[in-house]
Amino acid sequence: MSDKKNYYYNRELSWMDFNARVLEEAQKKDNPLMERLRFLAITGSNLDEFFMVRVAGVKSQIASNYTKPDDSGMTPKELLSALDKKTHAFMEKQYSCLYRSILPVLKKQAEIEFRTPEKLTPEQRAFTDEYFHRVLFPVLTPLAVDSSRPFPMLANKSLNLAVRLSSKENKGEKCFAVVQVPSILPRFTELPADGDTRCFILLEDIITDYLEELFELHEIKAVCPFRITRNSDLTIDEEADDFMYEIEKSIKRRKRGRPVRLELLQHTDEDTRKFLIKALNINESGIYEVQGPIDLTFFSKFANIPGCEKLCFAPIRSTTPPGDFFGYTDIFRAIREGDRLVHHPYETFDCVVQFIAQAAEDENVLAIKQTLYRVSGNSPIIASLIKAAENGKQVTVLVELKARFDEENNINWAKKLEKAGCHVIYGLTGLKTHCKIALVVRREEDGIRRYLHLGTGNYNDSTAKIYTDLGLFTCNEQFGADASSLFNVITGYSRPPEYKHFIVAPHGMRSFFEYMIRQETENAKKGLPSGITVKVNSLVDPKIIELLYEASKAGVRVQLIVRGICCLIPGIEGVSENITVMSIVGQLLEHSRIFRFENAGNPRIYMGSADWMPRNLDRRVELVFPIEDETQKARAFGILDTMLSDTTNARFMQSDTSYEHVDLRGKKKINSQLTFYHEAQARLKELQSIEKDSVLIPIHSAEE
């Protein structure tokens, strides 16, 4: 495209816009109060990871004198300057939301407030005194910083207190010390109530109030809370002889990554500020001064305090089908009778857990093969895989050790699986394995049958409660053959085959999507039915974006549901008038990936693990699969249509890259997530009714 930079929005700036949409949920007054705090905490944890990876990457480019503009036309220095400006403004909005919009309402409506030491009642003062001496004092370690004691290596994202001191013995002698706020203790503590008001105090405030007891020979001149964020992107030698050991070494190096952000309170003592800048070797562009408290992520736990259930969203509980699986106690029988599409969390993820659990115990199951990218800390799926191996089944598991920030967890699981006798693959050289697939090979009367679960999300029973994802259960023979071929590629040296139905990256997925978009463009030019509807988490790939622009120019209606980063710009005259971009941010995190192409009046729909990003299409093993069963296909179409009708959680991207809520005038208020929940409840009642009607009740004599 001749002037591509005008039509390609920078991915980092787009990510900042996404985090701003999450912040809007914290600002939204009709959201429950504790949920607003939870959204605020999410914006903080999102920003942490953004600095650890993306901002760190930009700074590394600048340090290595890399000056080439990106696809949006920005050089690394220009981008860092734009991010710096946008981040400062964003963090101001975070604290404005907290102090102007949330905490006053928390005090007025819920009678809950945070207190500082000077506002404590005598009873509360006695409580903090006892808490400090009994709990805190034994844990705290004051670390002096001088010529013989260097500045300590502080943990990434840890909260610390910088203390400027003056010696009582040597008048005028200045020195500094650091006290780390113990991360092992809760960030907040509930105080004795003040009348009807529930009161809380932050851990750092208690420590600050009693610092003199740690520095009896010194006079405290200033106390400054601070927090550092380190470069946490891993550099891994994938050719290493012991790949697991190489990952473990990289994790240790990450803990010593260079600081990329220093958070301070506004009006921090100037001498202490200079001391920290020098000690951490950080420049002004990495310093962020906030109103406080530093690090808002603790509000995610605070939102769960007992007694505040009415201040939270009504839970969207998964429906549990009668029996174990849609009215069947035998999962394999249910799948034999037809493909099953499951929409989480509206329909329980337990069916996926049960699929592996039943396979582990079934004497007719010969083998289980599965990919794992992110799993929970106490995964029932891994427990079942271990059980299956102990029961003598052939169990092969690909555990992706390079899943960012889950490396340690995955290493631990890989070791346990190996110890149990599973064949464990750590991933593929140069690629991350991100596809979601489980294959069960079972011996039956008519021969060997392969049962599959294919998904859009991780095999993680914890996140499955709050992420929306889709999964397909099938025993389609051709799907099974494709699955076996895929596992042969992953576990051995097989050449990528010609799959009958699967679309697999990095060999074939890019060309498939490019072909499908071009096909819709040609259909539009011929006057045939055309259209593209896609739901992904991120849209970044320049080539895909360029093809979507060409489709729009040809008259193809393109409807995009992109939760996070979107580098495509809709509504540009002569380029993208026929493209709409919607982002849904609400109670649940939208995570499913769905692709619909009108195909000249014979629509085709696909689901899978891949977003439209270069890393997914070119540098990962990803899987996208078609929905072919007519009943499930109709349901998949309906899922997309419901999302497109959302008027509550949806925002639409404008041609200036801003996002606007739906104008509700004359429109019905529709929350797609609640719609799916109510539909799932209705299906459950229907199944229960069918089950009840099928029960035969014997008539007994009156004497009985």
Question: Where are the regions that the model predicts?
Answer:
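N-terminal localization/anchoring segments of enzymes in phospholipid and broader phosphate metabolism
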Residues: 1-532, 550-554, 566-704
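Glycine/threonine-rich ATP-lid/beta-loop region of ATP-binding domains
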Residues: 542-545, 549
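Hydrophobic alpha/beta core scaffold segments
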Residues: 557-561
